[in-house]
Amino acid sequence: MKKAKAIFLFILIVSGFLLVACQANYIRDVQGGTVAPSSSSELTGIAVQ
């Protein structure tokens, strides 16, 4: 039971980290920050100027 809890916790941390990373990338795309027309903004359908 303890091993399953540890695996669940690990997955939770990893997914949380991925969510934060994607969110930061999305916000940077929307604000038109350092990465100009990025591939992720094209994939999500945001108009690239």
Swiss-Prot record:
> From what superkingdom does this record's organism come?
Bacteria
Give one Pfam family.
Lysis_col
Q: Give residues with lipid attachment (S-diacylglycerol cysteine).
A: 22
Lipid-modified residues, N-palmitoyl cysteine kind: 22
Q: Where in the cell is it found?
A: Cell outer membrane
Q: Does the keyword Lipid biosynthesis apply?
A: no
Which interval of the chain is the signal sequence?
1-21
In this entry, which stretches build a coiled coil? none
Instruction: Name one process (GO BP) from the record.
Output: cytolysis
Keyword annotations from UniProtKB, A to Z:
Cell outer membrane, Lipoprotein, Membrane, Palmitate, Plasmid, Signal
**GO annotations of cellular component type:** cell outer membrane
Does Lipid metabolism count among this protein's keywords?
no
Q: How does it sit in the membrane?
A: Lipid-anchor
Instruction: Quote additional remarks.
Output: Plasmid Clo DF13 originates from Enterobacter cloacae but is stably maintained in and studied mostly from E.coli.
Described by its record, this protein's role is as follows: Lysis proteins are required for both colicin release and partial cell lysis.
Protein name as annotated: Lysis protein
